[in-house]
């Protein structure tokens, strides 16, 4: 009887110890820290839209790039700093290339056109997924808008930047195409953000598509379009191909973080949007207005209709 009583008491003590919380346990760290409500909602939404990702995988991958999950404001401030350094380093690099005359000015301008927007979008996972993250991220191209205005108006002078972003080295050109380019990227960032494939379509067709259209068209564009002698079949095909491939690449990139769902249907929609953007870019009206505007608006409208 004594043995049975002792065993019973030990069992009760063990159960009590196991079920009771450890008061002195250290606070949780890293990605298991409390996160803002809007981050949790966004992650849950991403999970429900995709059956390919287990819940734990999406939660960890969605937060993997966020620097301080327990403090979204601090995390977004740091992300803004890192992205600004990356973006302006790219601009500085191409500006120096333009100043030294290493490449043809037209080629440098298009390389900047391709590079800046795509590099900026690579940094989006560093920001939180709500409107706060979108606003902090949009400050990066927003600062560039101010920079374009100051350069274009002649408030200050930067020969390298002007050469790398203008057709003929005239500072006033920055108030047209380059300014529309940055405005389009900023608008896509704020309005659509990283959970929308429309943002991918707009930026990829604007940057990769339009940039490659000019490069390919100048090199292989001997066969001109019948309705626009300033455009070529090679340039239009190059634009549609580059915009489409970049869109698919970023689809898989954002899907790896759980922001969107990669699928064959989405790939097909990206193809349609890239073809539509290339067709509009080839029209004479795109030259009269500005292809940075027409491509962005076409991609956004087609994306709105398809997604």
Swiss-Prot record:
| EC annotation from Swiss-Prot or TrEMBL | 2.7.1.216
- What residue stretch is labeled transit peptide in the record? 1-65
Q: What class of enzyme is it?
A: transferase
Which biological processes are named by the entry's GO terms? carpel development; farnesol metabolic process; isoprenoid metabolic process; response to abscisic acid
Give the signal peptide range. Answer: none
Gene knockout outcome: Increased sensitivity to abscisic acid.
The family line of this record is: Belongs to the polyprenol kinase family.
Report the function annotation for this chain.
Answer: Kinase involved in negative regulation of abscisic acid (ABA) signaling. Substrate preference is farnesol > geraniol > geranylgeraniol, but has no activity with farnesyl phosphate. Can use CTP > ATP > GTP = UTP as phosphoryl donor.
Can you name this protein?
Farnesol kinase, chloroplastic
Q: Species name for this entry?
A: Arabidopsis thaliana
């Amino acid at each position: 009887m004594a043995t049975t009583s002792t065993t019973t008491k030990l069992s009760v003590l063990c159960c009590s110890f196991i079920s009771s919380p450890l008061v002195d346990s250290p606070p949780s760290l890293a990605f298991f820290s409390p996160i803002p409500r809007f981050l949790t909602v966004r992650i849950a939404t991403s999970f429900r839209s995709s059956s390919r990702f287990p819940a734990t995988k999406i939660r960890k991958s969605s937060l993997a790039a966020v620097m301080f999950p327990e403090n979204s404001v601090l995390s977004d401030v740091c992300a803004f700093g890192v992205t600004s350094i990356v973006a302006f380093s790219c601009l500085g690099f191409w500006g120096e290339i333009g100043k030294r005359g290493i490449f043809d000015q037209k080629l440098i301008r298009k390389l900047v056109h391709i590079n800046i927007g795509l590099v900026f979008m690579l940094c989006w996972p560093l920001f939180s997924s709500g409107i706060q993250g979108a606003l902090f991220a949009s400050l990066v191209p927003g600062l560039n808008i101010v920079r374009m205005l100051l350069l274009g108006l002649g408030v200050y002078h930067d020969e390298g930047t002007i050469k790398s972003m203008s057709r003929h080295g005239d500072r006033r050109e920055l108030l047209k195409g380059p300014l529309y380019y940055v405005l389009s990227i900023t608008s896509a960032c704020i309005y659509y953000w990283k959970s929308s494939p429309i943002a991918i379509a707009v930026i990829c067709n604007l940057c990769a598509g339009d940039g490659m259209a000019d490069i390919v068209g100048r090199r292989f564009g001997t066969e001109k379009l019948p309705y626009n002698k300033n455009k070529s079949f090679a340039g239009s095909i190059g634009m549609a191909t580059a915009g489409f491939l970049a869109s698919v690449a970023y689809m898989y990139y954002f899907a790896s973080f759980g922001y969107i769902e990669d699928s064959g249907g989405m790939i097909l929609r990206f193809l349609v949007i890239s073809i539509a953007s290339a067709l509009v870019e080839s029209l004479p009206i795109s030259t009269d207005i500005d292809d940075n505007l027409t491509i962005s608006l076409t991609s956004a409208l087609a994306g709105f209709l398809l997604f």
